[in-house]
A protein has these predicted regions:
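Active-site-proximal loop/helix segment associated with metal-binding centers of metalloenzymes
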Residues: 1-73
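Intrinsically disordered, low-complexity regions enriched in small/polar residues
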Residues: 5, 12-13, 19-20, 80, ...
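A structural motif corresponding to the C-terminal end of an alpha-helix
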Residues: 28-32, 76-91
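Catalytic metal-binding/acid-base residues of hydrolase active sites
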Residues: 41-43, 92-98
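Binuclear metal-dependent phosphoesterase catalytic core
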Residues: 76-84, 96-126
Length: 126
């Protein structure tokens, strides 16, 4: 966290959080959520390890815990959407600077490597 603040890699209010009361305010008949675009994804999505993050982990003693917490937030959001009848079909994320597509429980999870110059409409949305 300190390293990210010094290097201005994060804004103070950037960390995701789970707010079930706000989620309850979403009327799925008016705003049917079927696609999620986020910085990272639930913990059950690729990658499930921190392999390749050694450099960053040595410069930020809180990074490992921060990553775990972020992914737990998205675990909770995913569970809420599924349990409350939202017809989730796609989830796009890019945090890990790699490319991967997988289907989990009927949802297409797309890890987008923006360095490849991907386009959301061709890589994930379609």
């Amino acid at each position: 966290e300190a390293y990210r603040k010094i290097k201005r890699l994060y804004w103070d209010d950037e960390a995701p959080y789970y707010d079930e009361e706000r989620l309850k305010m979403i009327d799925k008949t008016v705003c049917p959520i079927d696609i999620v675009c986020s910085h990272t994804a639930p913990s059950f999505c690729y990658p499930q390890t921190k392999e390749g993050l050694d450099y960053w982990l040595t410069h930020d003693k809180n990074l490992s815990e921060d990553l775990d917490n972020e992914r737990k937030v998205f675990d909770n959001i995913y569970s809420y959407l599924k349990e409350n009848g939202f017809e989730l079909s796609k989830w796009c994320y890019g945090h890990f600077h790699k490319h991967n597509t997988e289907y989990i429980d009927g949802v297409k999870f797309c890890l987008l490597d923006m360095d490849r110059g991907v386009k959301l409409d061709t890589e994930c949305i379609n």
